[in-house]
Amino acid sequence: VAAVIDAAPEIGGYAVHAAKIARTGVPFFMSHTIKEAHGKDRVEGATIIEVDEDWKPIPGTEKQFDVDTVCIAVGLNPMNQLLRMTGCKIVDSPVLGGKVPSHSLNQETSVKGVYVAGDASGIEEASTAIIEGRIAGLAIAFRLGYLDEPEFLKQREVQLKSMVGLRSGSHGEARGKAKQYLNDTMEAQA
């Protein structure tokens, strides 16, 4: 990877991912965009250029890179078709990627006994999806009588604490707040 280029003035993704990339020595060029890709029959290079606060290119700030690939990321959308079919309440949360099911801290949706985790509950980091799945599993085990309440709450708290670091950075914090809003809304309706 020659560089990460983003027109935004700061990294919009999760800090954990940016840190992994930075540790490998890949440079970040914030407030930049790709001006041009070069090559005859394939990509052989790219020129980036700095942009101002209105995202307009600033002449004279071009930088050249020898690359054979240009990757573009444009976002993700939650997959909620099955949840809609079950009658789950769906809310709009642009921070979480769009239309997501309202759900509790235990990952239970507005339809009793229907739980959600991962991208279906809102686009977040993959490790967050795993933790949400664990929380949903614990809640189901508790509901079915395989865990008593103190043990369930103890294990759920361990999982919730492990999610804190994953929701660091401006992007992660915003998603954490959006999830908290969904949880609070469900608790108020209960």
Identify the residue ranges that each predicted region occupies.
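A short alpha-helix-loop-beta-strand transition element characteristic
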Residues: V1, I90-V95, L147-L153
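General structural feature for long, well-ordered alpha-helical segments within catalytic domains
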Residues: H17, M30, P78, G113, ...
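FAD-site-proximal beta/loop scaffold in flavoenzymes
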Residues: D68-G122
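Generic structural signal for well-ordered, non-membrane alpha-helical segments
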Residues: Y14, K63, G75-L76, V100, ...
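C-terminal auxiliary extensions adjacent to catalytic cores
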Residues: K161-A190
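A Rossmann-like FAD-binding core segment of flavoenzymes
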Residues: V1-R84
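Conserved mixed alpha/beta catalytic, RNA-binding, or beta-rich assembly cores of soluble enzyme
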Residues: F28, K63, D92-P94, T128
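A conserved FAD-binding loop/helix module that cradles the flavin
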Residues: A117-V158
